[in-house]
Amino acid sequence: MSFSLRIASRSAGGLGGRVLNRLSKLVSVRVATRPIAALFAAGLISWGSTADRVGSDGSALWSQLTVVGGPSVAVAENWPQWRGAKLDGISGEKNLPVKWSKTENVAWRLALPGPAGATPAVWGERIFLTSVTPEGQLVAMCVSTAGKELWRKTIAEGNKDVRGDEGNSASPSPVTDGEHVWVLMGNGQLACFTVDGQEVWKFNLQERYGKLNIAFGLTASPLLDGGRLYLQLIHGEGNPATREACVVALDKLTGKELWKRDRDSDAKAECEHSYASPVLYRDGKVEYLLTHGADFVIAHSLEDGRELWRCGELNPKSNYNPTLRFVASPVAVPGLIVVPSAKNGPVFGVKPDAKGDITAVAEAFAWKRPLNTPDVPSPLVHEGLVYLCRENGNLIVMDAKTGEQIYEKRTVADRHRASPVYADGKIYLTARKGIVTVVKAGREFEILASNELGESISASPAISNGRIYIRSFDALYAIGK
């Protein structure tokens, strides 16, 4: 008897010894009583013939192992940053719970010091979060997958709530590579810790790049890829003569700037501000960073940040809305980039081989949808379908190739701030009042469950270890066994 197991290697070169030496840090593999190296030596595990690069880490590889015979093997995927390993909201985890409540199918609940909109990052047996405290401290936390707090570090003082309960200074999501964790706060404080809680470096973005002029605070999460940390700082004071937006790449281990590029636009007023996060496009042939805001989505070279292409008319100049700030981020899958806008504006399906200014280049688009963008939740693409969760709870499903609408149905009539995630044939949609609607993936609309926790939620779910981790304003829940 044999079956395949896919594990992650952080080496783009030889896949042998380095994977074995660091396997426990990269993926949770449990093999009955025998060390994995011994299984290789015994011929019970062998490297498969294929290996393909996936994930947001540019050096990460999925390599196929073939496991022969008896041992019981289980693999848990990591969720290292906002929207998961590939920044697309997709998890390969199976046998996840469909129904739960505050008491049913909850492995544990850990009370947290205060609210946050940041999605947890999960690696192995550690979960990383941010929070504010009642005293206004901005803290980073590490929690075990058993639900025990391992450490807590104060990053800065002085929380700032925005728009009532819509956000605070703990909105950007942490990122981790299993050895370090990087935490960004709404006041610009950026810090790197070891996973054991030892500070490596810390500085404030505003001291390096100038005051952040953004109405509702910094919410863009950092993006980790290989040895680099990417940040989009899209903001401004509404003065076209002083454009302040920039994109930067930092060395993840030192915080040293590797490159910085000004991000030009002609956006006006509040449109200069962006609350979206950067994403990557990578398909084995081309790769680049995508930044979203100030009326444009722009692709940048990973090496030096130079602009490769841009797309405008997301805020049409013929009917310009000076309050149209982007919150939802694009989602990129091989062959397609789905670009949202804001406030019932358009959604574009962009072909990834774009070059230059594609705004008026018809052949650069797979399709265009003139209305019904999600205002806050980011799109999801899976198996040829595009899922748009609108802020009112409506779910729109479209054909990814043509943009044709398949259906639009109501889930929960409430604000939706979290982005949808997919796992095990299901789409998980999180309403602000604490209800998670589980919808069957596919062309037919079917609600499988409506699960109420009774606590406010803005963070997107994280999926790992056979569980769904949900960060409410009050607590962290581990949903599952």
Positions of PLM-derived features:
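N-terminal secretory signal peptides that target proteins for export/translocation
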Residues: 1-31, 51, 56-57
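Hydrophobic alpha-helical context, especially transmembrane and signal-peptide helices
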Residues: 4-8, 39, 60, 75, ...
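Noncatalytic, solvent-exposed loop/strand surfaces
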Residues: 61-481
